[in-house]
Amino acid sequence: MNTFAQAQFMTDVNGRPVKELKYTDIDGSPYLREDWSAGLIKTQSGKLQQFARVRYDAFQDELEYDQAGKYFRLAPEISEFSCGDGTFRNGFPVIDNHTKDSFYQILYDGKTKVLKKIMIRVITEKAYGSATETKRFLKEEKLYLAINGILQAIKGDKKAIILIFQDKKEALETFIKNQKLKLSSEDDLLKVAEKYDSL
């Protein structure tokens, strides 16, 4: 048990013990969205299962479901899930501090994939002139491109993004110029990925 969570042992759908984590002394929420929503999960074997109430714990990078008022963590055999926050998938190459089990939100799902990694971490703060420390959850997001089985982090400037698409650089530069894309928004990036797949 860590210093900021109390664990209760429960059983998941496969009969294995799992921990329901209750964060007691941290401000904010570990969930991407506090509300529950209907969800659909896909296992590694391709089996689909629907749940009436799920939510994504981005701090633990796990999906939680509610069954008759009891909370359960879904087993690691899950490869994909969809809920009110979008569609999330794992199985991508290891990058940064993320593993093959890490879930990414799928923003564009063509031959090229645009992914968003949503991370929630705990930070400790001390108010000026105070000896008291407080902990709170902080949400961070990072965009990635998956091209030909390679995962690459997306940096904010146009030149760095064009370098990722180097094999079709000239056509994309023309497209970006004609469309007046600044590549500073997710929408612009999705348009470029879609164009890349069409070339």
Annotate each predicted stretch with a short phrase.
Residues N2-A5, I26, R136-K139:
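Short acidic/polar alpha-helix capping motifs at helix-coil junctions
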